């Protein structure tokens, strides 16, 4: 049986914490779709196509590209999972706040399409990193290179 997982997120921008979760998921499943999804509750810094391109480059640069596909969707996440035959969502969880936010969605996803959600704890080195923190530091001219892949750091430092 070919096991497919989806790692969804806004990835605005992709961080080293995201790459850690993606890499670990790629070791656990045969195929991993890293899915850039539109979050109506967030104001995007980067267009979706640019986020997918940054994911592709970051995954390639990290040397973990073998069984990983970067894509995007604006529809219902479980519909994407059904379309590709995935039964698992993988989410990184940094704190109780993330657990409280993700748990109701995990329950609904299981109800809608029998898609399970697996939570991965962060590497301690990345536990404090979030895309919103990166955006804030970058907007104030700070160095984000310790928190993001080189492609993202280059883009944000040139903006």
UniProtKB/Swiss-Prot annotation:
Cofactors that this protein relies on: Mg(2+)
SUPFAM superfamilies assigned: Nucleotidylyl transferase
Compartments, record wording: Cytoplasm
Chief location of this protein within or outside the cell: cytoplasm
Enzyme Commission number, as recorded: 2.7.7.3
Reaction catalysed by this enzyme: (R)-4'-phosphopantetheine + ATP + H(+) = 3'-dephospho-CoA + diphosphate
Site (Transition state stabilizer): 18
Record's keyword terms, sorted: ATP-binding, Coenzyme A biosynthesis, Cytoplasm, Magnesium, Nucleotide-binding, Nucleotidyltransferase, Transferase
Top enzyme class: transferase
Domain of life: Bacteria
Gene3D superfamilies named among the record's database cross-references: HUPs
Gene Ontology biological-process annotations: coenzyme A biosynthetic process
Keyword hit for Transcription regulation: no
Pathway of action: Cofactor biosynthesis; coenzyme A biosynthesis; CoA from (R)-pantothenate: step 4/5
Gene Ontology cellular component terms for the protein in this record: cytoplasm
Binding site for substrate: 10, 42, 77, 91
Binding site for ATP: 10-11, 18, 92-94, 102, 126-132
Keyword Repeat: no
Record-linked CDD domains: PPAT
Gene Ontology terms for molecular function: ATP binding; pantetheine-phosphate adenylyltransferase activity
Assembly, per entry: Homohexamer.
Protein family (similarity comment): Belongs to the bacterial CoaD family.
Main function: Reversibly transfers an adenylyl group from ATP to 4'-phosphopantetheine, yielding dephospho-CoA (dPCoA) and pyrophosphate.
Protein name (database record): Phosphopantetheine adenylyltransferase
Source organism phylogeny: Bacteria, Bacillati, Actinomycetota, Actinomycetes, Micrococcales
